Amino acid sequence: HIAAYAELNVLSNFSFLEGGSHPEELIERAAFLGYRAIALTDRNTLAGVVRFHTAAKAKGIQAIIGARIDIEDGASFICLPKDRSAYSRLSKLLTLGKRRAQKSMCKLWRSDIVEYLQGQILIILPPLSFSASKLYIDQKRIDSEFADELSKWVEQLSGSVYLSASLCYREDDDSRLAALQKLAEQSGAPMVATNDILYHHPRRRPLQDLLTCIRKQCTITQAGFELELNAERYLKSPLEIKNGYEKYPDAITKTIEIADRCEFSMTDIRYKYPSVLTRSGNSAEDELRVRTWEGAKKRYSIDKYPLGVPESVKKQINYELDIIEKLKYAPYFLTVYDMVKFARERNILCQGRGSAANSAVCYCLGITAVDPNQSAVLFERFISEARGEPPDIDVDFEHERREEVIQHIYETYGRERAGLAATVVTFRSRSAIRAVSYTHLTLPTSFLV
């Protein structure tokens, strides 16, 4: 049975040293609990969304893509793009914040957000201090400032701003939910239930405490209120969440409303290849054919091959070109050809490798060095209509002169259309053991793997 609830506030371990579960674990648990939709909203990053999407697709669950945005002059909020254009704007916003800050940090102000609001759904996160009269002396000021901030968001993005309500499992939960509901009615931002997830299962709590100690650079005995007060920030069943909001059923139904509005999927993202590499009047397909046959004549020159290009190679080239044209990959091959041509003209060592070595076209373009006339090539390992995956040509450039190639790419296609692959920082056994030892915390070795 699938209950009518979608979890919209979830951190994974891509919120480094904060989230205690892998995206795949969250999806696995969500499928077990009967979720039809769940969001991934890591803090100031979209780094985990591909793994999240892949796992969700395998389980038949809607993966809602988003991020938790922290700003310097206001409350944090969940940002959920409704379509591909909104996802692009969210990516640009996070890039802006990352460029301003030190490594792994993000620095944004409210004024930055306005330019990127179109197509977004915002779920504003009230501070834990909201309506907590027994804990804070200046409670009225805290509540008033947050109410004013929420009203401003509603004015700027009417119809797409919601107010998050999470059970803190404190004695003042009832009064806090009542205060949030009242504020929602006053501001016009509907209240929506979230559970502020940090890990997929209750037994992951000790690991999350450990991560907190490492992040705060303290021992477990020093951590105190830095640790979560309880083990409730795990992925609960939709029915359990629903029971916690019996007085506020609309807060549950709003989660499905938001899920339905978030139509963006990672499958919406497609390669858009450059179109500036063709001669006047030529299509990309015609240009690729010309370049390939020019290269074939050089590879199979008369002095080595008196009869010209071998018939078997001609047949293979035509076969590959037909598939490339059918799948509209010609601009991609021309792009790689341009980079390799640039490098070779400047005597920069380069070599294509991997599955591209199974392509006669790549050989004729000078990208790879495997002669299809001397070895059996299996083009389907490189490009397959059945797989429906775009080709992947790996080219190595000599380290000392790689920057020249990068600058050529920037100048030819524009810096805004080029990207460098990033690596994800992870713990390995030795570094994990060292970090744990600093916290003076003993854990089973299974937590360190």
Question: Predicted segments — roles?
Answer:
Residues H440-V449:
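Single conserved hydrophobic/aromatic residue that forms the stacking wall/gate
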